[in-house]
């Protein structure tokens, strides 16, 4: 009974902090990326169960829950991407590119919630849970494969293989954003057509 939705949300934030700490400590030993992966599991636990607990107990607070849940989601997303950029795995500019793509999709989700009363968690087949699983897989590959040593010189700049993977992920996020925007813009233009202007 002592566990509340707010405490689960806070646990999710702690998980994101652990991810960032694990990423930084990976400069000492790459096995600290396991701490980062544990942080993602903890983040998933808190983020997935806070709303579920409220529904089971019938203590939903739609306005407060939406406010707390999604403002802290933005914070945890920033912490996770900072952890990526501060780790030996990925350049900070690549991590920020992923952050920009993810936040664009998040903002798009919130706009659609208000405009068309549809809350989308998944784009394509990619949702928050799939993103966490992808990050855990990337951490594991970095620890146990020689891929971390693969680097390319592109236009005079050094790019690691995981930087290229990060850029690919960012491109996919922006592709989902542009694709869904194009589709919804057409539908909304028909639903809310332009009014004729008479000077």
State where each predicted segment sits.
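Acidic (Asp/Glu-rich) catalytic motifs at the cytosolic membrane interface
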Residues: 32-82, 108-112, 182-186
